[in-house]
Structure formats: C-alpha cells, structure tokens
Amino acid sequence: MSDVAQRLTELRKTLHEHGVRYYVEDAPSIPDAEYDRLMRELLELEAAHPELMSSDSPSLRVGGRPLDAFESVVHEIPMLSLDNAFDDGELESFYRRMTDRIPAVQHSAFCCEPKLDGLAVSLLYENGVLTRAATRGDGTTGENITENVRTIKSIPLRLQGADFPTRLEVRGEVFMPKAGFEALNARALKKGEKQFVNPRNAAAGSLRQLDSKITAQRPLAFYAYSVGVIEGGELATSHYQRFLQLKGWGLPICPETKLVTSLAEVKAFYQDILQRRQSLAYEIDGVVIKVDDIQLQERLGFVARAPRWAIAYKFPAQEELTLLNDVEFQVGRTGAITPVAKLEPVFVGGVTVSNATLHNADEIERLGVMVGDTVVIRRAGDVIPQIVSVVLERRPENAKSIVFPTRCPVCQSDVERVEGEAVARCSGGLICQAQRKEALKHFVSRKAMDVEGLGDKVIEQLVDREMVSTPADLFRLRAGELTILERMGPKSAQNVIDALNKAKQTTLPKFLYALGIREVGEATALNLAQHFLSLEAIQQASLEQFIEVPDVGVVVASHLQAFFAQDRNQQVINELLEQGITWPALTAAPVAVDSALAGKIVVLTGSFTQLSRNDAKAALQALGAKVTGSVSKNTDMVFAGEAAGSKLAKATELGIQVFDEQALIEFLK
C-alpha cells in the first residue's frame, strides 16, 4: 500500500471513529478544530488522488453533484405505517386484540420509544457499507436519496465491528432537532429567505433536495427504529436487543427507548414522555409500542397497511379557539359533498390552520355549529384539523345557520342521500366538473397510475379548458397542447408526456385502484387481482363472485357490480386499453388437482401456534382453496385456532364444518 493510500485509510478510520463518538455517543474525544483539520487533509488528498476515492469516505458528507431527479426504489419488504391509539381505551383494545389472537402476548415485554415527527427512511448496508438510502414513499416504492443521506453526520457510512449481516436494511426516522430548526430559521430570516413552518417540513424539504450540498448544510439527525432485510447473518430475537446490536454497530438509537413488562408500564412510559415532551431536543407526537419478542411479531403478522404487533399511541390533540367565518361545500371524486369550515387562521400544533372538515350534515347538527361561532379547533393526532365543540356563550346575535345544499354547488345536479349513509352525494357523475377533477387527480396519483409532473393544478387547468374529461383523454394529449397551460414550457410539457407513456406499463392492482371505485382501496384492488387474475374476469363477475374475494363484503361487492355495470365506465376502460395501458399477466399458483381443498371456500379464525395466519392462507391457496375473510352460506369449511370468536359461532349456526389447528396441519401435509 502506498503512503498516500495508507494515510487515507488512517484518516477515514479516525474520522469515522470520532464521528460516532460525537454524533452517536455524544462523547467527543477531540476538539472540533482538530476534527476539521483532519477532514480538510482528507479532502485535499482525495482531490489530488481521485483514483483512491472510497464509497464510505467521511468526505461524502459534504455533498456531491446535483441530480436531475430521484430514482424510484422498490422496497424488498414493504415499509408499513402504524395504526393509532388516542386514549387508554384504544390502547387496551390493541392489547386485547393481540392476546385474543395469541394468549402468549400476555407474557411478552414491550419495547417503547418516542414517536419522532420526521421522515421514515431505509438504509441498506452491504458488507457493512451504506450502499443505498430511500424514502418510505407509499410503503412499496420510495425514492433513492443516498447522496443526501450520506451528508447526515449521525448515520454511519460504514458499520463498526464485524459481526453484522452481509446485507442489513436499517429503518429509522430522519428529523431536525429543535435547536437546529431554530438556528436554520434564524439564518433564513437574516438572509430574507422563506422560513420553514415546523421541523418536520424542514427535514422533509432538506431530504428531497436534488443538490446534496444543500442537504449537507441542514442540521439533520437520525434514529434507527427497526430492521427490514437481513441476509448473511442473524439478529437477536428481541426487538430491544436488536436496538443494542444496532447501537454497537454505530447506529444512533433514541435514548428514551425503554423495555417494559406490562400494559401498566406502557401507560406509565406514555405519561412520562408526555410530561417531558417539551424538554426533549426533538419534536414528537406520541410513543410507539411494539411487542418485543420477534417470533410473536411474526405470528401476529400484519393487516393491509400496518403490523398487528405495534401501535402509535398519539398525544392528546392540541386545541385552540378561533372563529368560523364561513362554510364551503366541496365535491369529491365519488360525488361526496363535504362541508369545509373556513376559519380565522390559527396556529395549532406547529401549523397555521384556516380550514377544517365538518364531515357531513349529521356532524353539523351534532355540534350545533353556526357561521360566526367561536369554535374549538383540534389537530387530531397532530395531523387532521377538526372542529370539536362550540363556545356557545360567545355566539353573536348575527350567527347564521348552516344550510346543506339540495343541489350540487358545482354542476347544480340534485344532491342525494342514501338511507343509512351519512354522506350526501352529487348525482351528476362525470358531467360534474368537480367529480371529473377529483377522479383524474386520483387516477394519476402515486399509488394509482403514478404520473409524475401531472399535479392538481395541471389537472384543474386541463378540465377547466375542456382538454380532458376522462382518464383516457390524458393519454391523447400532445406536448404542444400542454404549453398553453400556466407554468408549462416545452420541456415540462414533454416531461408530462413522457411520464404518461411510462405510466402505461403498470400492474392490474394499480389500474383497478386508479379507476376510483367506491371503497376499493389498494388492499382490495390487490385482493381482486389475485382472486380473478384478469380484468376480463373482474368485469364479468357477479355480486356473489365478488363476495368470494377475501375481505370484500356485500357493500363493496355492490359498489363493484354497479361500477362495472355502467356502460360509460366500461367505455373508459376500453379506451384506456386502446391507448396502450398494459400490465404483466397474472397466473394462479400451481394447484394439486387431487387436493381435498381444491375449489373449497375456506375461512381462518382465531390464532394458530404452529404457523402464522398468512402462512396458512398461502398454503391453503396453493392447494386450490379460496380463503375468504367472512363466513357465509357459501363457506365450505372453517379452521379455528385459539380464541376463535364470532366467525366460529356463525359457522356453527350455519352448520359449516369446523376443524382445529391439528386438522389444518394434516390437510396441508
């Protein structure tokens, strides 16, 4: 090894070690000036010898060349969100759901940590070196932000030690400490630049800079909270012990993280953090509670978007008084008419709130609210503004009643309210401009067709100018037509056309979700695709066939049937296919034709000790069974584990065959 190469190795090792001591252990061992001197020496040597550059060099923290755009990253294991609890009752319900499913949870410890108000990221380490960082995105697909993340000094570019897996994905939160946020805004104020509203926005904006040199100037920090991919090695079977392993490898862990042994201790942890919230160095909006035993986590499994073994216990919403100046009625993509309160702007929970939903006519009546009232505004879970009560003693004499419209405020079609539903809807369908706009916005959204650059304002202009009326019209647009829109030059117009062409290659679940069928979310769209395997089969399905799909009940099935029964919807679908929208063909898993389960409609209920519900479902489907989420007269058999509830009772009432876990294992052999 040459003298220069040896010195570079020494400098990188020294700077890595001191970086961990300073940013992770909060125990600096050399003066800042000495650290800066070593960094300058490293930069000078690397500039003089670019052939000796290393991907894990501490010098990368100063940022690299600007990017044209962020690349997409598909998460090998989805980054799910968490369900929320807002009071002790909801926390207890969460605990009861787990113990009903797996009684052993009663004897498990819980790992508790503050819920940081930042941005979730994924860090991939290969042979100990940080090779990729990505945002959470929609949970399935995020953005590659590796260059930006390398500038965050508390994130190690190379792990310490040697006992880590060869591939290890670390997940955590990037945030901006309060002191750093205040200093950043003070500098912006001094320079006459725009200030950030809150630390979370500042962190998110900093991470999404195309120029990593800007990110490098922002005071960002990181705490790890879980792992994803683990290959070529093993981690502890305790969530808390995994934290200690990560810390040993140089990754920062929130110092408030605590292991507790009972629900009472969980509540005590919550109260302690709540009382100390303002004194913490970072913004939080609750605490996260996780079952500590990794095997129990695996047995509990997941629902569509969240794990069953973890929950976010949110802090009480922050409330303020303000005036209700007016109420506007907005029309959504399914025709739902929502009253929106126009408020005197008020700062609540870190943001200025000027609008709040009043939900529907029933909610207005329940609140007894009138225009001109002083109202209590709350950001539930520090996120969604809502009016929770009226200060009646402050009601002015000229307060006005809120009258729900009988005609659509946009297209003047009749407003209808189906018996048993709280929501009133415009009956205009696609002749209603508001519904067209919202349907198109949904169609191009990230979780649907994911058309980059086709934002809300562009959609509104396209509809207002009568350039599009259905989703298929979007794919008929030409770049030259788009340049008449505001802030749409030739390059931007071509980018939109390129994005539309790229979006033509999609998946059947995304296409179904993009159609905007009432109450058909991502999970239902995925179930439909996996059940029917083709669009043609879905288009021709009966109500009874829709009900056979896992987690599709009578209400959703009726919405599906009504949607595909309308000629105009079928016409739009055909036009989209004519424009070249395609997706990979789906095939059913190989089925053993002599299986006793082939073609049977099966329901799983209760908890199983020898395999997870997801594993049981997959094994049953591989043998040709159709696994559904509810018991009906069409169900052939029910497999009941421990603590089986209403599904078992209904199966018994209907005279359906019920088998225990051991019988399930025998069927699967």
Swiss-Prot record:
Residue ranges of every copy of the BRCT domain listed in the record: 592-669
A family per Pfam: DNA_ligase_OB
Taxonomy, superkingdom: Bacteria
Recorded catalytic activity of this chain's protein: NAD(+) + (deoxyribonucleotide)n-3'-hydroxyl + 5'-phospho-(deoxyribonucleotide)m = (deoxyribonucleotide)n+m + AMP + beta-nicotinamide D-nucleotide
EC number: 6.5.1.2
Residues involved in Zn(2+) binding: C408, C411, C426, C432
GO CC term, one of those recorded: cytosol
Gene Ontology terms describing biological process: DNA repair; DNA replication
Keyword Transport: no
Keyword Ligase among record annotations: yes
Alphabetical keyword list: DNA damage, DNA repair, DNA replication, Ligase, Magnesium, Manganese, Metal-binding, NAD, Zinc
Cofactor(s) required for function per UniProt: Mg(2+); Mn(2+)
Cited SUPFAM superfamilies: BRCT domain, DNA ligase/mRNA capping enzyme, catalytic domain, Nucleic acid-binding proteins, RuvA domain 2-like
GO molecular function, one term: DNA ligase (NAD+) activity
UniProt cross-references to InterPro entries, sorted A to Z: BRCT_dom, BRCT_dom_sf, DisA/LigA_HHH, DNA_ligase, DNA_ligase_AS, DNA_ligase_CS, DNAligase_adenylation, DNAligase_N
Binding positions (NAD(+)): D32, A33, E34, Y35, D36, S81, L82, E113, R136, E173, K290, K314
CDD domains noted in UniProt: BRCT_DNA_ligase_like, LIGANc
Gene3D superfamilies, per database record: 5' to 3' exonuclease, C-terminal subdomain (1.10.150.20), 6.20.10.30, BRCT domain (3.40.50.10190), DNA ligase/mRNA capping enzyme (3.30.470.30), Helix hairpin bin (1.10.287.610), Nucleic acid-binding proteins (2.40.50.140)
Active site: K115
Alphabetical list of PANTHER family matching this protein: CHROMOSOME TRANSMISSION FIDELITY FACTOR 18 (PTHR23389), DNA LIGASE (PTHR23389:SF9)
Reported function: DNA ligase that catalyzes the formation of phosphodiester linkages between 5'-phosphoryl and 3'-hydroxyl groups in double-stranded DNA using NAD as a coenzyme and as the energy source for the reaction. It is essential for DNA replication and repair of damaged DNA.
Family the entry assigns: Belongs to the NAD-dependent DNA ligase family. LigA subfamily.
This protein's name: DNA ligase
Species this chain originates from: Vibrio cholerae serotype O1 (strain ATCC 39315 / El Tor Inaba N16961)
Lineage of the species this protein comes from: Bacteria, Pseudomonadati, Pseudomonadota, Gammaproteobacteria, Vibrionales
